[in-house]
């Protein structure tokens, strides 16, 4: 079994850095489970990797990965491209600029999936 409960795949494509930061802060606030934050860049015109890596460190996100697709492939294929880098037992896609509801959102998803033998969901 994976040691990481859930991977959040944060999809980005030419978003403002402030939008990406909003989402990253929302993930960093999570408690009650282990998570990986995986930023999946769909070949934005400018890479945000250095800034995202620095912010992840500042926020205390220890399990952080940034992957950049070599060409723009749209959201679904961007997520599919990121999946091999995911370490979590479960996956939660999140669009840049979106935030999780509260600090226990990921823990609630993990608990629900485990309690109900969920293998896939949206």
Task: Please identify what each model-predicted range represents.
Residues 1-122:
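Nucleotide-sugar donor-binding/catalytic module of glycosyltransferases
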